Amino acid sequence: KNLYLPHLVAGTWSGTMCLTEPQCGTDLGQVKTKAEPNADGTYAISGTKIFISAGEHDLTENIIHIVLARLPDAPAGTKGISLFIVPKFIPAADGGIGERNPVTCGSIEHKMGIRASATAVLNFDNAVGYLIGEKNKGLHAMFTFMNTARLGTGMEGLAHMELAFQNSLPYAKERRSMRTLSGTKEPNQVADAIIHHADVARMLLTQKAFSEGGRSMIYHASRYADKMFEAAMLGDDAEFHKWDDKLGFYTPILKGFLTELSIECAKHGMQIYGGHGYIKEWGMEQIARDARISTLYEGTTGVQALDLLGRKVLLSSKGKVVRDYTA
């Protein structure tokens, strides 16, 4: 922690989550990346990871990869996955930048959207890795990353909704087309602004409602997180787990709901813009392209549903979380 966290918090080093491989994404029990023990207590990491956000760049001095891999004697499936730190540059004795680790970028993906994010294929060729936590318990540790990332992806969905609305509203006020069926609204103009047309108003109000409602959901989740933090600071384990369970139950709802609605809001934006919505220069088509990934990464919408019902409601609490939430 003393070696890595100060650099990561300061932003001089950055990090990645290396889970997905060519043959598996959601089903991480199929992970094939190997971790062979070295005599000095480190591990030799070999394998290929794909879809790694910011996997390679020169924006920071070092990139710290958090990698799921298997030890030689690991059990099959998800019970045999361990977690490793694999830095791009091995830290020197003084905490600075040391020698280059054999982690290379095989390619950068050419994507439909989020093109400013370098999505990399990473090859690990006996790279030096350091075990995090217990052997074969890596997936449990990684889920602490993933749950936080799912909340962040829900916020991404909210951002796309709000951006679509903020762009659609002024366009609808300025663009003029015909007279409304309910009567002329702007007699001094050649035609009424399209915001007065019922269908356009409906789409704008839908964007606005989803955006404001989504923001309320984010605040609700933030309250749970604040309560968890407060309990942790007070050393109250029972209270911490109470709010952790609530946030865990709420996370797949928030992630799945807000990301799906972000696509709908972007779709409405393109409809409001008409033909201009299909043209790159106007920007609305980029929102539609960028929003699409949010329903896929950090667990697809279907996976969120399985997590909610299977793990959070039935397996973990036998329905107690629902009863507590609605009480």
Spans of features found by a protein language model:
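Alpha-helix capping/hinge segments and adjacent helical runs
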Residues: 114, 220, 241-326
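Structured core elements
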Residues: 16-19, 32-36, 44-46, 51-52, ...
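Short Gly/Pro-enriched turn/cap motifs at secondary-structure boundaries
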Residues: 23-26, 56-58, 75, 111-117
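A short core secondary-structure module
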Residues: 42, 46-100
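A glycine-rich, basic-preceded beta-loop-alpha segment at the flavin cofactor/substrate interface
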Residues: 51, 90-106, 111, 118-149, ...
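Internal maturation/activation junctions in enzymes
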Residues: 1-37, 222-244, 251, 262-266
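Extended amphipathic alpha-helical segments enriched in small hydrophobics
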Residues: 150-231, 318-327
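Glycine- and acidic
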Residues: 1, 16-18, 46-52, 62, ...
